[in-house]
């Protein structure tokens, strides 16, 4: 993979990883022209996106750790931990059972379309409730489950699944739902990346990698994800997610058309 292609894929990952539009759906289209992504490459560009969100929320994370004596911080941190543990336990069960849909165009396309419809419904339902900021235990549990659903069904979008299940479960405030979804995603994605990285090294998948290309992709993904998430957090203060939902549906239909005509696997 040449350096320009690595940078382009880093841009795509950075934009799409935390926006509720599915990074998988975009990367599967891109690789038709830019070449197949190795497991190591996928891990590296995702790690860059996770690092960006960690940087954005570092003060919040430090506050949760150092301010554990505060009942509000302690309650919030406990809910983050429970959501993460639910994801981790269910993730191990799913891995053991070997249940995961293939990353091919058709299932990803349907996940995009169904997810877009789900987002429109969630916005409609949330608009009819008071914009509560509270993260309840029900929200924490459902967010933990939603992360696994997103992992099992490529194209769902982890951020989309978690944000909108939080909104439907009672956290009507978009900013609060998004913050909790992103904070839960930090340990979840670090753990998943570490697991996949160890597995890749153990299986010899790192042999022959172009480390310069990996470095470029990592840096680009980090910078672009930082900009994308900062923009998203500002956008949702006064806007709904409806445009993302419409975009998902259009992309899903496009993928179905490309699959039907043989342009994509």
Swiss-Prot record:
Principal location: membrane
GO terms assigned for molecular function: undecaprenyl-diphosphatase activity
Transmembrane segments annotated in the record for this chain: 38-58, 80-100, 107-127, 135-155, 178-198, 216-236, 244-264
Compartments reported by the entry = Cell inner membrane
Its GO CC terms?
plasma membrane
Return the EC number: 3.6.1.27
Question: Which controlled-vocabulary keywords does the entry list?
Answer: Antibiotic resistance, Cell inner membrane, Cell membrane, Cell shape, Cell wall biogenesis/degradation, Hydrolase, Membrane, Peptidoglycan synthesis, Transmembrane, Transmembrane helix
Q: What does this protein do?
A: Catalyzes the dephosphorylation of undecaprenyl diphosphate (UPP). Confers resistance to bacitracin.
Other comment: Bacitracin is thought to be involved in the inhibition of peptidoglycan synthesis by sequestering undecaprenyl diphosphate, thereby reducing the pool of lipid carrier available.
UniProt protein name: Undecaprenyl-diphosphatase
